Amino acid sequence: MSILIKNVLHKDTITDVLIEGNRIARIAPNLTTPEGAEVIDGTDKAVIPGFINTHTHAAMTLFRGYGDDLPLMEWLEDYIWPVEAEMTAHDVYVGARLACLEMLRSGTTCFLDMYMHPLETARAVEELGLRAHLSYTLFDQGGAERAALDRKRSYEYYEAFKAFSDRITFTLGPHAIYTVSGEQLQFCHKFAVEHNVKINLHLAETKGEVDECVRQHGLTPVRYLEKLGILSEHLIVAHVVWVDDEEMDLLAKHRVSVVHNPASNMKLCSGYTFKYEEMKKRGIRLGIGTDGCSSSNNLDMVIAMKLASLLGKAWRFSPTATKAADIYHSATIGGAEILEIPAGRIAEGMLADLSLVDLNVPELVPLNSLTSNLVYATSGSSCIDTVIIDGVIRMRDRYVLGQEEIIAEAREVARRLFGHG
């Protein structure tokens, strides 16, 4: 299948973009329309790479607005985990479909997820056409029996994911160092190396986590992981607010990827001094995440970019920190590098994972800088008009096929879980 986008803005130039199969084939003005190609009029639109959300919990869209304004551990132990214990696999599927819809409508084409029932999330992703790396979440607080079950399920899920399209990739998701034992973390590392998959881990999110790690192990979180021998290019760590210079050196040395989640870090008061500039100087691969809707309330990567940029400026008292271009890079190319996919750029040979931005929305006028306008002036749900993933149109004219049914079913499940939807 071919798609030709005509007269679209790309790098300050009006041009055409030809998609053949699932790749961007040509970028040039006045391209000839291939026989049978679908033509999209790009007038008054800009083509941009799809955003890559490198940390979220998709099905937690169902928790939006529940348990707000609470500290992390009270929020988890008294609000989130009790409801999750009541959720069915179908609930996860419904919440994940709502998440995929929300991400499509705000220009996200790929995401890294961590949640229970990953096959249900995979089913939702398959149906709505996104690209995703989906983690099986491991906890072993239940002792040796639970740890053994998680190891068994890791192998089972790895095999089960082979039934899905190549847009969907299996990863391991040990929840955190305070919910997963050192032995289980070492299992995850061994599994990741043997099967060439990623490990998705919360790390150094709060000061309390760091203090408890020092109390239990005599080491801060990053040093603890180094002692366990699991720092590697397979590891993706989210939050990483409470780290020192030596720990950042270790992350860089072992090619660990780091994901900044500004919304949840601020909302839960986990910490705000994310050391973006220091990590960037060390060559650490940096991504941007929305986190789940239970802690950030939306999955809009455009809003996440604005928060990441402004937060970095605010705590440093430096208007030149966390520049719009750098944050935009982390939300696109940075995410692609972390997940090792040929995406994140509008260039010939790249995956056709892209969005068309409506340049006629008021907050994008005038267009002195598209990058600055995207990071500082708008939201994805306001300005994204069309989304193409893997060479297939998944949203056009702000409409996703079946969106009414997705929203209605999510409301029904939320009413059962929370009493209202």
Where are these regions (language model features)?
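Alpha-helical scaffold segments that flank or form the walls of functional sites
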Residues: 64-130, 153-164, 411-419
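Metal-coordinating catalytic core of metallo-dependent amide/deamination hydrolases
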Residues: 120-241, 246
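Histidine/acidic-residue-rich catalytic or RNA/ligand-binding cores of hydrolases
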Residues: 207-219, 247-249, 269-279, 296-313
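Active-site gating loops and adjacent loop-to-helix segments of metal-dependent hydrolytic enzymes
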Residues: 62-94, 128-143, 148, 155, ...
